Design a protein with these regions (language model features):
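A glycine-rich (often HGG/GG-containing) alpha/beta subdomain
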Residues: 1-146, 150, 154, 330
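Short glycine-/polar-rich loops that comprise or flank the Walker A/P-loop
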Residues: 16-17, 50-52, 299-303, 326-329, ...
Length: 457
């Protein structure tokens, strides 16, 4: 990269103790010297790498702020380029002024994710490691963070590279045998080839088996709270969120649109969606909310169906139970503080599902509710033992393509297909796996991936 880029690496929408303006590229230190006036009257070009210096940031001779400046010289930096980081006071205005000074001194404003993109293009990290950076930033729970850190450390890359190496070794042998059949006996090596492909297929399949837990770890459990009007759905949301997120009244139809809240349950994220109470209504707005609730239930990982246990089941209840009969459902018998009319036995006569009795008003039964959710998803213990989880849809699809190609190779071996045709499917698997770590990537795909990053990263 010939140009030098700069951006604010901390928040641009709120003030803080400090802000960081990052500069990376061949002229980073030169630009740093243009804007930095050291208290010791030293030049950044003359200092050792990975050192910190105190002084003022200036723009055309006008002092903007006191700052600490960190100098990091290539190649031992995040981007493998010269980097200068300016730690200034964390006000929004002063930080923008410092960035303006750097841009006026010759830097170009970085695109979103461009620092990490340069780390990838300069070979410090591969593409899956680069994607792990944004996953670390967006991690919602401890498990997602740990998985992302493992990916950044290269544990996924190592598994992918091991599979690719086995594939490539077999392609090389087949091609050598085709060129020199007198010295390389393909027929004698068929069993070894089949064994290698089966091992590769097994390794790819083991990665794919982590996808479901990986998605839950990364995105959380899509949880829709469903029920009739005034069953206590919004009260339950407030109790689980431990704050007054939803308006609660005795008036039916108070909740007309969805309300979302994220909670952490023993290290796993539940994405709770409170929905409009399901009933027949002539109100246009409420009707839209009811239809939206039904559609959300169709795509939910978990439906929490809240029943007013102080009332008998009616047609609206039966409609809801028909809607969710094929889903993973937890029925909450709410209003245990009142005389119970509908019981767990009544529900289980109609649906095969878990039930918990609570009082959202008195906040009783909530611990049992949380334990039941854990049992439904994690057999009572939230525990992830693998060091690598597939959390990216992109990785999942590429692994599936590679797996399909490897299956075609096995079919070809069993049907005694010509070896040169086997190499076509082997190379297809090799290339799709390479796309995961960026070995075979095209510029437009790389640009799409890095455009999802925040500015300054």
């Amino acid at each position: 990269m010939e140009d030098t880029i700069a951006a604010i690496s901390t928040s641009t929408v709120s003030s803080g103790g400090i802000s960081i303006v990052r500069i990376s590229g061949p002229d980073a230190i030169i630009i740093g010297d243009k804007v930095f006036k050291s208290k010791k009257n030293i030049k950044l070009a003359n200092v050792q790498s990975h050192t910190v210096h105190f002084g003022n940031i200036c723009d055309n001779g006008n002092e903007i702020d006191e700052a600490l400046v960190i100098v990091m010289k290539a190649p031992n930096t995040y981007t493998r380029e010269n980097i200068v980081e300016i730690d200034c006071h964390g006000g929004i205005l002063v930080t923008k002024k410092v960035l303006e000074a750097v841009l006026n001194a010759g830097a170009r404003l970085a695109e979103p994710g461009e620092f990490t993109k340069r780390a990838f293009l300069n070979g410090r990290i591969d593409l899956s490691q680069a994607e792990a950076v944004i996953d670390i930033i967006n991690a919602k729970n401890d498990y997602a963070l740990k998985s992302s850190v493992n990916q950044l450390d290269g544990k996924l890359s190592e598994k992918i590279k091991n599979i690719r190496e086995i594939i490539l070794n077999n392609v090389a042998f087949i091609e050598a045998a085709l060129d020199d059949p007198e010295h390389f006996d393909i027929d004698a090596n068929v069993d070894n080839l089949k064994n290698d492909v089966e091992n590769c297929l097994n390794n790819a399949d083991n990665l794919l088996k982590t996808c479901d837990n990986g998605r839950i770890m990364h995105d959380g459990v899509r949880t829709v709270i469903l029920g009739k009007t005034n069953a206590g759905k919004s009260s339950l949301l407030n109790v689980l969120a431990r704050e007054e997120r939803a308006i609660v009244t005795d008036i039916e139809g108070t909740t007309r649109d969805t309300l979302e809240e994220m909670i952490n349950l023993s290290g796993i994220t539940l994405n709770l969606i409170d929905t409009a109470g399901i009933r027949k209504t002539d109100d246009v707005v409420e009707s839209i909310g009811v239809n939206k609730a039904k559609k959300l239930a169709e795509i939910a990982d978990l439906v929490i169906y809240v029943v007013d246990s102080s009332r008998v089941l009616d047609d609206n209840d039966y409609e809801i139970m028909e809607l969710i009969k094929d889903k993973k459902v937890l029925v909450i018998l709410n209003k245990a503080d009142l005389a119970q009319v509908t019981t767990a036995e009544d529900i289980k006569k109609i649906m095969n599902c878990e039930t918990v009795t609570i009082s959202a008003k008195q906040e009783t039964g909530i611990e049992e509710l949380e334990e039941t959710v854990k049992n439904m998803f994690f057999n009572g213990e939230v525990k992830f033992n693998e060091d690598v989880y597939i959390t990216s849809t992109r990785h999942k699809e590429l692994l599936k393509k590679a797996e399909n190609s490897l299956k075609l190779v096995l079919d070809g071996i069993d049907n005694m297909v010509s070896e040169d045709f086997l190499t076509i499917d082997l190379m297809a698997a090799y290339e799709n796996l390479g796309l995961i770590i960026g070995e075979e990537i095209e510029d437009d795909l790389a640009n799409r991936i890095f455009s999802k990053f925040c500015m300054g990263k």
